[in-house]
Amino acid sequence: MSAAFGIKADAATHPGRMPLASLAWDARPARAGVVVLVLHGGAIDGRQPNRVWSHNVIRMLPFARALAKVPGPIAVARLRMRYRGWNGDEASPLLDTRWALQQLRADYPGRPIALVGHSMGGRVALHLGDEPDVRLVLGLSPWIAKGDPRPGAGRRTVLIHGDRDVICPLWGSRHTVDELLAQGREAALIRVARSDHAMLLRAGLWTKLVTEVVQVAFADELGGGAGDAGRDGPGPHDPAATPVDRVDAVVQTAVQRGGILDL
């Protein structure tokens, strides 16, 4: 157990000198209404070990810290996967994330889990959306490959994607959400104008969207009025709405009704 830009980190056990997956907790209350697992991005292939300071790992730190400040009983953990890449049929990130989910379920049995993943982490979240206790899949500029599984009934999927993403094209998220909606699933796509794959352009908006989606999706579990925020305010396409009003309205619509929305 070691400090890792969070409260503490738990490491998976692997034989020999193999890299270890680790779980860093940014919020670990004795009791939680909801548990959030934050998943970083990666590459198609690569056996370089992810380090605490790796850029793909560090990029998710602001999201985890913001989620840890959400009012209510929330637990937040960041997974650092062993390898940089997906690595073909081995699908290394899936093995690591299943281990992490076991740790979350052991600490908080029966509590709903939200998977928040960027790029490759978004792909992991979509793959594991049907894992026990997972209730929300929140993909940020997700990498989606042909034939990837989709979360099933009882899961809510919200994808957020920048329209300037040249790494993981926006159309992948659009196709996925269209497919889920056609199957009667709870799904939404929030398109972020003038933003890139790394979520550095309009970074503050990305962080706000992530925290608000989690708050609205788990309003009952968090014990607040998050589910009512903005409900009676301007709609998502109201030109008179302030930027804050529009974000609130878009999140409300995405979580409660689904569809394709723009910011």
Predicted regions and their residues:
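C-terminal catalytic histidine-bearing segment of alpha/beta-hydrolase fold enzymes
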Residues: 186-263
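Alpha/beta-hydrolase active-site loop
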Residues: 87-107
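Active-site nucleophile loop of the alpha/beta-hydrolase fold
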Residues: 139-146
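Short alpha-helix in the alpha/beta-hydrolase fold that links the catalytic acid
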Residues: 51, 169-179
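Gly/Ala-rich beta-loop-alpha elbow adjacent to hydrolase catalytic centers
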Residues: 116-121, 125
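Short, surface-exposed "cap/lid" segments of acyl-processing enzymes
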Residues: 4-71
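Short beta-strand/loop motif that positions the catalytic acidic residue
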Residues: 153, 158-165
